[in-house]
Amino acid sequence: MIALMEANALVVPIKAAGGRWTLDKRLVGLTDTDARIVIEWTADDADIDLWIDEPNGERVMYSNKRSSAGGQISNDMTDGYGPEEYAIRRAPAGPYRVRINGYDADRINPNGPGHVLIRLQRNFARASEAQELVDLDLSFQNGRDRDNEDDTKPVATLRVGR
């Protein structure tokens, strides 16, 4: 689904530049969103989890994939470099707090702790799209097999205004 979102986001600028695309028309859809957050990481044997705290206090994560406000998170990637994605098409105003849970962050790696790249995107696949990048190392994570707020920390915030 993440790749389909990225491919659909290219349709408008390609058409605006006079180009053509070869994406099957059945796969072209409305994928623009008010808020989109994507993470990817540098260690293929790490399990990094994306958690989003929505303005109403609801947490969207692998065990709560769809929120009452309409936000949804992609499948939990337990192997490889990710990515994991959160998207909400019509986002209520307020802060969307990003938490990273380094469930198995591979700190034994001789190259040091892994890094996570966080893409905070407003108005994804729209002419007014804006993006902020956050690069974070995972050295703040201690232990493994954690699944509660005390063992994570907020690492970024995407604000939606109306």
Predicted feature descriptions by range:
Residues 13-162:
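Intrinsic-disorder/low-complexity signal
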